[in-house]
Design a protein with these regions (language model features):
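Short glycine/acidic-enriched loop and turn motifs that connect beta-strands
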Residues: 43-47, 93-97, 142-145, 191-195, ...
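Loop/turn-rich, solvent-exposed surfaces of beta-rich toroidal or solenoidal domains
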Residues: 299-367, 371
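Beta-propeller fold detector
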Residues: 63-72, 110-118, 156-164, 216-224, ...
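Short, conserved, GDST-rich strand-edge loop motifs in beta-rich repeat architectures
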Residues: 186-203, 249-263, 316-331
Length: 407
């Protein structure tokens, strides 16, 4: 069984049962309220364990640190998925917590726990992709299955077996997928027992699943550039479509742990008229490891997270091997950058501290990009305005900030 380290750099077998919440009438989950949902993480000294907390607040305060007194404790480095006013918390490391559904009430600005879906221990349910109001895909990283559930009732309605697509072991390690034109594109990380890509399988594999039939139509692979580990199971923005509906997938490679292989970057599945004609286009792939980060002397050793801004621009966290001092799990080796897919440039964003590999969240708040940071001297959320190039701290937190959403 793989006890994967995906969630500390990004993320992070067996029958499945499900049940409704034990309480017939849902009750508010905590006393906190507000229109901003924030998750923070307190790491133990080894960087491999700790505690995470989810809470609402109205106070974006860069002076007084947000504590966890009115927070819900969630599994360490758990995932959070939001659809409208539905909030899903997933146990991305273990699985015993399962998938918890919360409902946000805009009138009271509070969260109420609604229902729970039980998953096997160590199955690693990292993300939930809604197909419709009554159907969602729940890929399991450590089990070679994609569960199909009804997100309204939180009941299982089916499953897709993907074991046959695994390389050298029992699970192909499902990543974070995306739906385009009625098909679910599901990247497979294909990691070995050492938590790294197989040396004889340095490529990116993606399953194409018909969302009407739940059948795998085909598997496609990008083998030219040797970019591996496509997507991160807990990060929605690591896979995206451009204005032309081309799918780009972030590839972390060896997370910078292998000095002999720092290949990382992006692979592309262009828009196509038919599934049979759908393939990767290696001419649109980009290995960023040889590109100097403008404003520094470093080149990326891996890429942690990404947020597509439009017109070929991406806000991202990349790592520099030169910043690894003692423990790569807690070293401040993450650099906030602006990537241009068209010009093939990477530029450091000034004003955002270097962070560790846990706190590398990137999201949006209106026209601003929000970065979650756990720096040497500052922790919290930092905003970046792509139009002006101005960045600033908008929230001070006691723990490292690794999720943000504005209702």
């Amino acid at each position: 069984m793989k006890r994967v380290i995906l969630t500390f750099c990004s993320l992070a077998l067996l029958s499945v049962s499900c049940k409704k919440d034990d309480t017939p009438t849902p009750t508010p989950s905590n006393e906190g309220s507000g229109k901003y949902l924030v998750k923070t993480t307190f790491k133990n000294p080894d960087g491999k364990s700790g505690s995470s907390y989810l809470q609402l607040t109205n106070d974006l305060n860069a002076t007084t640190a947000l504590n966890n007194k009115q927070a819900i404790q969630v599994p360490y480095m758990s995932s959070v998925m939001i659809y409208g006013n539905e909030v899903y918390s997933l146990d991305a490391i273990d699985g015993s917590y399962g998938v918890r559904k919360f409902i946000y009430n805009p009138a009271t600005q509070k969260l109420t726990e609604s229902k729970k879906f039980d998953t096997p221990a160590h199955s690693m349910p990292c993300n939930l992709i809604k197909v419709s109001d009554t159907k969602a895909y729940l890929p399991l990283y450590n089990v070679p299955k994609v569960l199909i559930i009804n997100p309204q009732t939180m009941q299982k309605t089916g499953e897709i077996d993907i074991q046959r697509y695994a390389h050298s072991d029992s699970s192909p390690d499902a990543g974070y997928g995306i739906i385009r034109d009625g098909y679910f594109y599901l990247p497979l990380l294909q990691l070995g027992p050492d938590y790294a890509p197989f040396a004889d399988h340095l490529q990116s594999d993606v399953l194409i699943i018909n969302v009407q039939t739940d059948k795998v139509e085909k598997i496609i692979s990008e083998t030219t550039t040797h970019l591996a580990m496509p997507s991160q199971p807990s990060y929605k923005t690591c896979i995206f479509t451009t204005e032309n509906k081309d799918i780009y997938i972030m590839c972390a490679g060896y997370f910078g742990f292998n000095p002999a292989n720092t290949h990382s970057g992006f692979v592309c599945i262009p828009q196509s008229t038919t599934v049979s004609a759908t393939e990767f286009d290696s001419s649109k792939s980009w290995d960023i490891s040889n590109t100097t980060i403008e404003g520094t002397t470093y080149k990326p050793s891996t890429i942690y997270s990404a947020e597509y801004l439009g017109n070929g621009r991406i806000a991202a966290f990349v790592a520099a091997a030169e910043l690894n001092i003692d423990n790569p799990f807690i070293d401040k080796n993450g650099i906030a950058v602006l990537i241009d897919l068209n010009a093939k440039t990477i530029k450091k964003i000034d004003g955002i501290p270097y962070t560790d590999s846990h706190s590398v969240f990137i999201g949006r708040n209106n026209n601003e990009v929000i970065f979650g940071v756990s720096g040497k001297e500052k922790r919290g959320l930092f905003s970046y305005d792509p139009a002006t190039g101005i960045s600033k701290q908008v929230l001070n937190t006691e723990g490292g900030a690794d999720f943000f959403y504005a209702f």
